[in-house]
Amino acid sequence: THSSMMVSGPYRLPIVTFLKEQAAESLMHAQLAGEKIAGLDGHPSQKIAKIEETNRHTIKDILEESLEHELHALNLYKKLLSSVENKSIYLEEYARAQIGEEEQHSLELKIMLKDFS
């Protein structure tokens, strides 16, 4: 949500809405992952992944940082998929669904960034 506070300019309103939706969805993904971990007799971490502050706040910079975040999440879900493949259909399906969502978000951000090329 920090990024959404830093957006300025004529595209502010739709981009702020988009970034807030992404933040809410990230929280939902974390809660879902925690539920899966707890359901498998694990202990979900209370740590929050650090998001590096670059102090660059143009719309292009914010969207590029968001894209990097999505691509990082995509790689983590791909690693999860490779570790659970042929071991748990349930976790495979979960990982595949998350990969699909992250790919969709990445594509949306790439399209948004085309205006800044």
Give names to the regions the model predicted.
Residues 1-117:
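Iron-associated oxidoreductase/ferritin-like identity signal
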